[in-house]
Amino acid sequence: MQILTDPRTLQQTCLRWRADGQHTVLVPTMGYYHSGHESLMSYARSVGDKVVVSLFVNPTQFGPGEDLAAYPRDLERDAALAEANGADILFTPQPADMFPAGHATWIEVPSLAGTLCGVSRPTHFRGVCTVVMKLFQLAMPRTAVFGQKDWQQLAIIRRMARDLNVPVDVVGRPIVREQDGLAMSSRNIYLSTEERAQAPNIHHGLALGRALVQGGERDAAAVAEAMRRYWRESLPLAQEDYISIVHPETLEPLARITDAALCAVAFRLGKARLIDNMLLAGE
């Protein structure tokens, strides 16, 4: 495995691969790997000829007062895990490499970015879209792999690629969970022992909502209220950011649950902001 830091070197390498007809798969990450990241890399290895894993804590997707400085980092460990999971290149640029002085171009998908996480993080997805598009231009992948835990991010990147005619297949892979149901996240390290004990109830509440829908409940407000009641009792240390039942592609709020519905939630639990989601209907 090569470790590259220079964007131009990455681009030249990937240009050679493309000229040779190689299928490059990109796995964009911010590092501090867990089994969820490893599952993305393993999938990439299974479908591609070449695998590029990017590791970049992107400052443009953090807002004021967020955890940019505190975000966990362990490059040596991450490099070992990337290599063990089949990466051909680990791309680890510095912020000045990706956003040099004078950078003035930003990409946004306002119709999808202004809801859910975008309400409390209004500039987040602008930073995500811009860095992902830059990575697409550098790695020139045929496929890019993202986790479904960040469902809104996945929907936005898919729309960006479709609207801008980007020839990349954007693949979403299932959430990887701890044995007790907590969605794996690099930010779980922020949780205290007591907070960690409560955190799996986020998943359990989502499962409650799905069970209600499977049992015949179709009123989205009723399902959301049942989940909210459960979380009030089971997450006394948490502060609700949002609980929303939306269409999984358009992210538009639903009043009635019919063929496709996603419940997406975010809670602040101590120093951690935890997101999770579950399809209540549809595949």
UniProtKB/Swiss-Prot annotation:
GO terms for cellular component: cytosol. Its EC number is 6.3.2.1. It is found in: Cytoplasm. InterPro entries: Pantoate_ligase, Pantoate_ligase_C, Rossmann-like_a/b/a_fold. Beta-alanine binds at Q61. Catalyzes the condensation of pantoate with beta-alanine in an ATP-dependent reaction via a pantoyl-adenylate intermediate. Belongs to the pantothenate synthetase family. (R)-pantoate binds at Q61, Q153. It is an enzyme of class 6 (ligase). This is Pantothenate synthetase. Pathway: Cofactor biosynthesis; (R)-pantothenate biosynthesis; (R)-pantothenate from (R)-pantoate and beta-alanine: step 1/1. One of its GO terms (biological process) is pantothenate biosynthetic process. Homodimer. HAMAP family: PanC. The active site is at H37. It comes from the Bacteria. The reaction proceeds by a bi uni uni bi ping pong mechanism. It catalyses: (R)-pantoate + beta-alanine + ATP = (R)-pantothenate + AMP + diphosphate + H(+). The keyword Mitochondrion does not apply. GO terms for molecular function: ATP binding; pantoate-beta-alanine ligase activity. Pfam families: Pantoate_ligase. ATP binds at residues 30-37, 147-150, 176, 184-187. PANTHER family: CYTIDYLATE KINASE/PANTOATE-BETA-ALANINE LIGASE, PANTOATE--BETA-ALANINE LIGASE. Keywords: ATP-binding, Cytoplasm, Ligase, Nucleotide-binding, Pantothenate biosynthesis. Signal peptide: none annotated. The lineage of its organism: Bacteria, Pseudomonadati, Thermodesulfobacteriota, Desulfovibrionia, Desulfovibrionales.
